[in-house]
């Protein structure tokens, strides 16, 4: 990290003063004394870079519109909370190339350009840190890298998108349809005006890309390899069916180490009541991690919001300020192959009027009768599901998580 030994305070710049950026400034301000004590030096916000002015903000005097003013200064850490993968990419690359550590909550940028940006950070003896990119305020990136470093991570299953979990919770609890629940989410500030990244599973796809790459020892798994199915086709009838077999419906992002290649996908899933993810409702996130020594552990908390996300960002600021940048983890530059979606062996629940037909047609697979119209079929390859459904006249099927 450039010039740290020459400064009495650690100067930082916040790039983008929206929901998360403003939360970072607020968190650093209200916890200033505590943070200084823990770091041993003051964390000083020197600049806030944004195209807008914020005359009502107590940080208004720190705002600049000039990127050159920021990057030509003595800042040691840049907080990238711009979002997207264009301007944020340019600024992040510029900062890292100058030896300025970057911390971010930008899952799109991390999932698409992570290998390149981590490499640039290593080459310039600085950090690229992204705890807040997955799970908002939930600690998950650092635990995977550090606390669970002695484990082979065999499985990750998570509810990693608060918008979709809120919508599904409202559909179940209030008995309303998808469109009404989406409008409620937008009215309450839990969904964007254009919610496609959330409801189509793209946001979850990016997040499981990051978690999978870390679990896969830095062998990069690009988001565009990962099959992602959203929630817009879920109906109230689906929830009635789920309830009848003791399940709830969640949008699950899944990683499994696999015997040959990793298994990674995002899909609406019937979650059994015995699973800890069953009780995760509203905008909350939860991530189940399974390690070969650990067994199972669940990380739970607020997956979005100004201060929860800012909390994770500020944790990275402190790590960049106190740690040795040689601890950077490497990601491979090229994406590694994962199991093709059609070849994935999954547990599914098939809904049919005549369960016996399913059992007969699914010969060779382990089956379990869950109700008069529900059959659990274990380990069936995705490419075989369509023929099973069409041959038996089944109504529908969905992934199952016990």
Region locations from a protein language model:
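Glycine-rich Rossmann-fold phosphate-binding loop(s) that bind the pyrophosphate
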Residues: 17
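N-terminal Rossmann-fold NAD(P) dinucleotide-binding loop
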Residues: 21
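NAD(P)-binding Rossmann-fold cofactor-contacting core
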Residues: 30-57
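Rossmann-fold NAD(P) dinucleotide-binding segment
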Residues: 67-105
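Rossmann-fold NAD(P)-binding glycine/threonine-rich loop
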Residues: 89-94, 107-134, 141-144
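Catalytic, metal-anchored helix/loop core of enzyme active sites in primary metabolism
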Residues: 153-157, 165-168, 172, 184, ...
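Substrate-binding/catalytic subdomain of NAD(P)-dependent oxidoreductase enzymes
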Residues: 180-279, 284-286
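A conserved regulatory-domain signal marking ACT and ACT-like small-molecule sensing domains
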Residues: 317-319, 323-402
């Amino acid at each position: 990290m450039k010039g740290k030994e020459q400064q009495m305070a650690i100067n930082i710049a916040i790039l983008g003063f929206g929901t998360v950026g403003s939360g970072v400034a607020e968190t650093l301000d209200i916890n200033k004394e505590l943070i200084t004590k823990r770091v041993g030096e003051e964390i000083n916000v020197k600049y806030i870079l944004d195209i807008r002015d914020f005359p009502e903000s107590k940080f208004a005097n720190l705002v600049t519109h000039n990127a050159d003013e920021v990057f030509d200064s003595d800042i040691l850490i840049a907080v990238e909370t711009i979002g997207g993968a264009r301007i944020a990419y340019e600024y992040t690359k510029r900062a890292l190339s100058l030896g300025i550590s970057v911390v971010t909550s930008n899952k799109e940028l991390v999932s698409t350009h992570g290998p390149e940006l981590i490499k640039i950070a290593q080459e310039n003896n600085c950090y690229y840190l992204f705890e807040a990119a997955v799970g908002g305020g939930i600690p998950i990136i650092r635990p995977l890298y550090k606390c669970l470093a002695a484990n082979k991570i065999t499985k990750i299953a998570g509810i990693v998108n608060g918008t979709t979990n809120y919508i599904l919770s409202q559909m179940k609890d209030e008995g309303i349809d998808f469109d009404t629940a989406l409008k409620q989410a937008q009215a309450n500030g839990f969904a964007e005006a254009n919610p496609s990244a959330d409801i189509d599973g793209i946001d979850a796809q990016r997040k499981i890309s990051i978690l999978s790459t870390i679990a896969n020892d830095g062998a990069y798994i690009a988001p565009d390899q990962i099959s992602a199915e959203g929630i817009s086709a879920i109906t109230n009838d689906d929830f009635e069916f789920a309830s009848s077999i003791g399940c709830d419906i969640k949008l699950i992002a899944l990683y499994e180490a696999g015997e040959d290649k990793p298994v990674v996908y995002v899909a609406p899933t019937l979650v059994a009541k015995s699973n800890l993810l069953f009780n995760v409702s509203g905008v909350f996130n939860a991530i189940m991690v399974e390690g070969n020594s650990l067994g199972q552990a669940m990380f739970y908390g607020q997956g979005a919001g100004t201060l929860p996300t800012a909390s994770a960002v500020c944790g990275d600021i402190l790590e960049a300020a106190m740690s040795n940048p040689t601890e950077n983890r490497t990601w491979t530059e090229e994406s590694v192959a994962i199991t093709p979606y059609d070849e994935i062996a999954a547990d599914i629940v098939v809904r049919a009027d005549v369960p016996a037909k399913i059992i007969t047609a699914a010969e060779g697979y382990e089956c379990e009768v869950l109700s008069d119209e529900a059959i659990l079929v274990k380990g069936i390859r995705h490419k075989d599901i369509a023929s099973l459904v069409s041959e038996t006249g089944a109504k529908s099927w969905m992934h199952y998580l016990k």
